């Protein structure tokens, strides 16, 4: 057995932790294999494709799940989504997105990426890949976004996209399907387009990251090194790669030049935009009484959660990468 990312042949193992889905029967007693060379990690034995399909159809979004969404009750996003905002604000630094170019989210979730695309991109045509009929109706009604069942359907219609977003979706792919999935992305990205990828920072070569509370329903785990190597050898050029996001351990915020430029613009918008002032006021009212997670309001009225999305530090909880097809 060789590592899909680097061809390494030396692996360590780690017990899989299933806190969120103990009654599904597919995430119990699993073992994670960790490539000692690059940090790419995967399950020693994958659930079958049918098991995964049934899980996402029946269990992932059901009531009581940590990932439950009732699309009949949630509404159109009225404020900012810090993660989606940061992903797209960074991505547009690397692409010339023209009016009516196409944006695709591979796993839109609550649809907030569509709201941020409408905010940051000029008249984008919005698309998603989604199976849930309630979600499909919600995206179309609130954001005029159209959905495909899968990548094969997109390829058959010959559609290309200027910006593709793969936010916290790649880790849900089966190892046996990973290389094929990446090859499909190459077929739908436009010649001058980009793909924005974000995954959890799970470099399990670092023993301190073994102290975690849950792995389910993730099937893959990435280090920044592994993510770069995986897509480089698959025919992509990596044009941006940073570890950022919420802190696992406290460190003073550190912004690179790209992130610093975006943060300065956002701060200026906060000072001069009535919409963002209202957004921050609403956040203060909602979260000031909470002391949980990493969501808090600093004395200057700027959310730490949004700043975290631009804070570069190897101990942060996410890896953000932007790629384009190699010429």
Positions of the model-derived regions?
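Conserved S-adenosyl-L-methionine
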Residues: 12-18, 236-247
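A C-terminal cap/extension of S-adenosyl-L-methionine-dependent methyltransferases
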Residues: 17-27, 245-327
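Phosphate-binding active sites in nucleotide-utilizing proteins
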Residues: 172
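A short glycine-rich, Lys/Arg-flanked "PGG" loop and its adjoining helix->strand segment in the class I
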Residues: 179-194
